[in-house]
Amino acid sequence: MIGHNNFIIQSVILRFFMFQSVEGLLTPGLIKQQKEQLKQTELENFAQADVNSLISHRTLFCDNFLIRLWRQFSLHEVTDLALIAVGGYGRREIFPLSDLDFLILTEQPMPADLAKKVEEFIQFVWDCGFDVGASVRTLEDCDSQGRADITIATNLLESRLLTGNETLFDKLSSIVGREDFWPRKTFFEAKIQEKKQRYQRYNNTSYNLEPDIKYNPGGLRDLHLIYWIALRHSNALSLEEILQSGFIYPEEYAELERNQQFLFKVRFALHLILKRYDNRLLFDRQVKVSELLGYQGEGNQGVETMMKAFFQSLQAISLASDILAKHYKEHFVDENGEEECQVLDDNFQMINNAIFLVREDCFVQQPDTILDLFSYLIIRPQAELHSSTLRLLHLALGQLNGYLSELPAAREKFLRLLTQPRGIERALIPMHKYGVLTAYIPEWKGIEGLMQFDLFHIYTVDEHTMRVLAKLETFLSEETAEAHPLCVKLFPSLPDRALIYIAALFHDIAKGRGGNHADLGAVDVGRFAAQHGFDCREIETMKWLVKQHLFMSVTAQRRDIHDPEVVMNFAAEVQNQVRLNYLVCLTVADICATNTTLWNSWKRSLFASLYQYTNQQFNQGMDNLLDNQEQEEQNKALALEILQSQGFTEDVQSLWKRCPGDYFLRNTPKELAWHAVLLAGVETELLVKISNRFSAGGTEVFIYCKDRPNLFLKVVAAIGNKKLSIHDAQIITSLDGYAFDSFIVTELDGSLLKFDRRRVLEKAIINSLNSNELTKLQGSENHKLQHFNVKTEVRFLNTEKTTHTEMELFTLDKAGLLADVSLVFSELNLSIQNAKITTIGEKAQDFFILTNAKGEALSERERQSLSEKLQARLD
């Protein structure tokens, strides 16, 4: 099949791309037509085609086009000119949207008429629809500019003569081949610095969910780094030549070749579906590319399977690039001074600052010694791994007959790593990077490179898991106390940190299998813990942590934590203080490692409040619900202290007598004091104030007015029209019918509102509330969201309360969502008593406390009607 397909492509080349069938002059229209025919042929035969052939044919097309055009402009008659492919074009890597990089080389500066003709030649190439990277230089220019700029130097190193003066090209080759043009050490260090800067732009991880095929860590640029180092050192021009030079092992060559082919195929497919040059695999493109590559499955299965293979390729290339660069540095760059050698044990030595494996067969003959390697990394904080050690480790992992965890000695060493200071940073994270976790934990391979096709999880499952572990370890440092005071207080005193580390390792390990990943992961961690000799109580703790790792997050963010019944139910599941301490640390680390924008002081206070209430419930006992009266009085007293410190002398009791008990629970003492100052002697029926001082995780909007129909709808529409995100809504009605409502809002990027934006929003809300008409929402959809299919789901929580109904709404987040929801509530004469607004990537997961027109809980018929109307409106 492949041979037949390549024959088709070759036939097209003979007819079109050699330009033998084209009579007369080339025109931009003709070239564009032939480019389109080539693209169509590639699309029709892409699934079965060999990507190397596709790239070669593209390169050949460009070669013959430029050579013929060179003659058409009579530039072949000029003896002092050479047309040279450089950069990616020079190494024959042309994809459908690649830049066409070429150099027009001359020995001496051109006369004006020739310069004009060359300029017209370059413009013609642009007119044909190519993105052109053209330069016109003399030999002297190439020498001086190449020495000054590493990018120019690298391009020149990859030069390939297309047509023109061969002697001139040879002179260029001599210039760039001189040792003093870019000395090997200087060239290597410059390229490594480029790589470091590139990695920093991508958070030092291969696992960005909308990756750049070229520049992402592990992308094509990491392959190019290997090429460039080998090219500067030995003039090797391809992986095959690098293999022949002895720079890489046959096993390394096979792995690099396989992963290069995969990235080439993905990039070629991406270029076929785009109109403009780009190498980013954005979500919408991932779907199309996976289809073009033939990936199939229900829902997102096809795209997730492709992206898993993609991320595994990135990780393999990144690792190979690191190892080979380290190998080159150790052997060819570092000064040839005396090596400092220190014996660590029979198997390991320290050579300078690198851990060196003495016996090459050690890892194969005694696999448990692999764990010793990481123990030495902990003991010696400044040490790194020698390139030969890494290469032997990589080869040994491929020869294991079973999992390392099957070896008693390895299990003992693994558990010891978890108890060491910086054991996560210096052992577990490197073990993941170098493939040892995959060799240790049977289930780990299933999540390696596994992405979730959504906007919420910005890392793959394995990368997220390592970030959870890393975050947990930071709770041992006082430097983390400002952002995580509760966790820094609790984590050092946990009975056994190994339990939470292992629970973190397994909390998402069953993702991608179908079914409830928390339940399946609990089974996995139970088996692993039993294998490692933990007792029944410890095993049950780990199983519970994995099974319930989302429980605190859901309760804090999607339940009314000021409701004593909610606190009682949460405490009943947690059971005791030790579990609570474990759970809060795991939950916070999980949130922080999921998405860097999720954690803020508002959420910190939310989780701290739930922790505090649960503590109170444990201390009081589980026989009775919490009485919130004590907390209400404490908040009042603290608010009075704040007011007195500010010199506030007005009587607040008359104001507070109007407010229900919930008002003093749901607002902090600072907010209570702020409201008292705002409302002192207020005569207006409507007050809107916005401040950044009371919720560091967002901007607080406080609204005081006589309660009125559609109040919530008008407010959220006004906020939505200003392109803001709503994170929390607190609806409180005073005993005399006034709204004391608060909203937490941010800009779309999560930042606080600046002064001008706050004033504009105040006016917009006042105008909306004073208007007799409902505010029309103006806005544009987030185009990223259209690629996600989220069906609306309405859930009513099972409570025995007759005073209100609690409802959860799951739907696609979109512009004006809350306004649409509020409109449905309004149509059914429902009142919102409270709301929690949570956006999880592309999904809205909102919680509402509602009453009907009678001020009671919704009947079954009212629930059914509400559910149907919401689904009809939102889907």
Curated annotation (Swiss-Prot):
The gene is glnD. Its cofactor is Mg(2+). It comes from Mannheimia succiniciproducens (strain KCTC 0769BP / MBEL55E). GO terms for molecular function: [protein-PII] uridylyltransferase activity; phosphoric diester hydrolase activity. Has four distinct domains: an N-terminal nucleotidyltransferase (NT) domain responsible for UTase activity, a central HD domain that encodes UR activity, and two C-terminal ACT domains that seem to have a role in glutamine sensing. Residues 700-782, 806-875 form the ACT domain. Keywords: Hydrolase, Magnesium, Multifunctional enzyme, Nitrogen fixation, Nucleotidyltransferase, Repeat, Transferase. It catalyses: [protein-PII]-L-tyrosine + UTP = [protein-PII]-uridylyl-L-tyrosine + diphosphate; [protein-PII]-uridylyl-L-tyrosine + H2O = [protein-PII]-L-tyrosine + UMP + H(+). CDD domains: ACT_ACR-UUR-like_2, ACT_UUR-like_1, HDc, NT_GlnE_GlnD_like. It holds the Pfam family HD. One of its GO terms (biological process) is nitrogen fixation. This is Bifunctional uridylyltransferase/uridylyl-removing enzyme. Its EC number is 2.7.7.59, 3.1.4.-.
